[in-house]
Amino acid sequence: MTKKSDNVTNNSKSGNGISRRSVMKGAAAAAGAAAGSGALGGFPTIWAQEIKDIELTHVGVSYSVVKAIGDQASKDLGFKVTMQNLDTSAAINRFITQPNSVDIADVEGWQAKLATKRGVLQGIERAKIKEFDNILPIFTKGEIDGVQIPRQGISPYEAMYIEDPMATDLHEGVTDWMTFLPQVYNADSMGYRPDLVGHEVTEWKELIDPKFKGKAAILDVPAIGIMDAALCFESAGMIEYGNKGNMTREEIDKTIDALIQLKRDGHFRATWTTFDQSVQLMAAGEVIIQSMWSPAVAAVRVKEVPCIYAPVNKKNGKEGYRGWCNGMALMRHLEGKKLDAAYEYLNWYLSGWQGGFVARYGYYSPVPTTAQKFLTPAEWAYWYEGAPAPEPISDPYGVPMEPVGAKRDGGSFVERVTNISCWNTLMDEAAYMNKRWNEFKVA
């Protein structure tokens, strides 16, 4: 981060914030259009004949870069969008070492920081983003509902802005140029099998409780897994951290040493790196508590296996969710009509269809007002308001997931987001942390 902004010019709707009341008000009037309602008016705005042969390659992790979303974008925009999935480490490596093989890089804040520093991205011109003024203040002021978003780790607000399109350093505060356009985010915690655990889980320390020896698992993505571990050890009172999102070497050593001891004691049944692995472990009952992503919990439920996403609201200076945000970045090689098409694609993403789609497996849109138009009133009530489902709730593909009366784990959008305690990150000691994490893996 290079400097604070002293000339923020964004005094638009997003500057007013989005209050608990305005976010959570009923959707009956606004939610008339459901998913699959057809092409959106106004797309594309450049001549269809000129863009019909264009193909954009959007690369990133499977929970963010989804084929069904690319297919709908292609249908609505008139040019082809190809989605390619890589895990977190492989994706950032591809962006940096093979930048010309990617058009749209799907990045988290820490990846945007790294890719910007390496000079492989070009800035996104804020004036060309039609819904920018309606983006939530999480991304324009670093706050929501009057509550400042925590700065442990790298919050999206800290990684979003640069001073000019070819800048290689971040700038704190809204400018005319962005490193990435946020498209999906959430608050992560643990998943558990209530039928096998036997009680409600609301604290991270449960993941390392000896009573779950041989039945627990943790995420094996070093930069994220170590933060889940830190939340556990902090919750249990075993380790105190100055900043879980940017640990000292001493804190890294304490954390990894504790993980290695747990592994040697047989505590972890497995570590996992992919969505499917986490679903299989939980659905089969091989593990009964683990680090987990929201759509993975949903996927277990679709199999008619009970699974709960632990509500880890902050208390006594501990607990809280691990926040993350993925967004779309423009690779530096884009120019001409292909760059124009990329802007059409970015604007399509915030126009509502994608926001409605991802809501159905528990993720949030940076512009809920457009996503709401593609959700039924019942879906909005369940996913955003945290209200009991007025009717059965289905996943993005129409598969029944929740019965009437079910409530979302963790409550409303505002309740969940204001209980984030840290964000996915790239630590200053990342190289050392990765070395120590590998020692944990082979222990």
Residue spans for each PLM region:
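Glycine-centered hinge/linker elements that transmit conformational signals in sensory
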Residues: 225, 230, 242-274
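Early extracytoplasmic/lumenal segment of secretory-pathway proteins
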Residues: 49-118
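N-terminal secretory signal peptides
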Residues: 1-19, 45
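A structural signal for short loop-to-beta-strand junctions that line the ligand-binding cleft
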Residues: 101-105, 122-189
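N-terminal export leaders
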Residues: 18-39
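Mature extracytoplasmic/periplasmic domains
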Residues: 48, 328-408
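Conserved C-terminal helix/tail region of periplasmic/extracytoplasmic solute-binding proteins
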Residues: 397-443
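Extracytoplasmic/periplasmic substrate-binding proteins
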Residues: 267-336, 372-375
